[in-house]
């Protein structure tokens, strides 16, 4: 699979929610795109990843004046 442009190998079948935890992402302040489509936060546990998937994960950070 590809994660933010880098190749990753999935060792087992894994749900998106578990993958995010394993990779150190907090699901509270991120957006996930899977194969060109945004995944709603409520679906993270239902989405099973495969080696052919492409994920783009964007983390939101606070800041400003």
Predicted regions and their residues:
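Ubiquitin-like/PB1-type beta-grasp interaction modules and other compact soluble beta-rich domains
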Residues: 1-65
């Amino acid at each position: 699979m590809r994660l933010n442009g880098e190749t990753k190998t999935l060792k087992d079948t894994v749900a998106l929610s578990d993958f995010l935890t394993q990779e150190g992402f907090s699901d509270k302040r991120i957006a996930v795109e899977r194969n060109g489509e945004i995944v709603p936060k409520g679906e993270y546990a239902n989405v099973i990843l495969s080696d052919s998937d492409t994920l783009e994960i964007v983390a939101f950070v606070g800041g400003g004046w």
